[in-house]
Amino acid sequence: MWKVNDQGFLNITVTGTKFNLIAITGKLGFYTDPPSHLMIMPLKIFPVHKFSKNEPNKKQKRFIYF
């Protein structure tokens, strides 16, 4: 179960499964393992790091594992 609290933070509660949160430029995606569903939503309440064109070798995907 997930919800956004009064301060604008994303609270995630997971029982009995491995849970993965994926942050992609401008969007937030998360799925369960095994993947039963995938949800993507705009990152309006999260800061997004701006990648420079002079840094093409840097990964533009950040993976956060719970």
Swiss-Prot record:
Sorted UniProt keywords: Glycoprotein, Late protein, Virion
Q: What is one term from the GO cellular component aspect held by the record?
A: virion component
Q: Does this entry carry the keyword ATP-binding?
A: no
Intracellular or extracellular location(s): Virion
Record's note on what induces expression:
Expressed in the late phase of the viral replicative cycle.
In which domain of life is the source organism classified?
Viruses
Q: Which residues are glycosylated?
A: 11
Disulfide bridge map = none
Q: Which family does it belong to?
A: Belongs to the asfivirus I177L family.
Give the protein's recorded name: Protein I177L
Look up and give the organism this protein is from. Answer: African swine fever virus (strain Badajoz 1971 Vero-adapted) (Ba71V)
